[in-house]
């Protein structure tokens, strides 16, 4: 199974986890899989992990949880998407908290105005 297919399968798991919060769709996104609500990407699944969109305020909770940005290698160089941070394991494991963090990420995506 390719990295992209693994990401899509895991993304579907998160769609199920977030079903009580909102209708979520998924689409491949540069080898990852984007999670969308009403056309706005607010999360990505990449290399077996879930990443939510952050802003300066929400990033503090991720830093406190010792999380990290979505990192990747391109042309042999390390890069990071600083606007996406890995969702901490304790959040992923608690559906109610996961939905709260997803709502925050979605609100941040709305502020960005990007589809």
Language model features with spans:
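Charge-dense, helix-prone N-terminal extensions
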Residues: 1-115
């Amino acid at each position: 199974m390719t990295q992209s297919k693994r990401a899509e399968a895991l993304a579907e798991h998160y769609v199920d986890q977030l079903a009580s919060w909102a209708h979520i769709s998924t689409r491949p996104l540069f080898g990852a899989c984007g999670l969308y609500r009403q056309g706005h990407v607010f999360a990505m699944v990449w290399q077996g992990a879930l990443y939510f969109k952050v802003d300066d305020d929400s990033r503090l909770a991720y830093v406190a949880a010792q999380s990290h940005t979505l990192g990747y290698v391109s042309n042999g160089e390390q890069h990071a998407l600083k606007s996406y941070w890995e969702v901490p394991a304790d959040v992923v494991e608690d559906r109610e908290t996961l939905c709260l963090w997803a709502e925050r990420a979605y609100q941040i995506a709305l502020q960005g105005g990007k589809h």
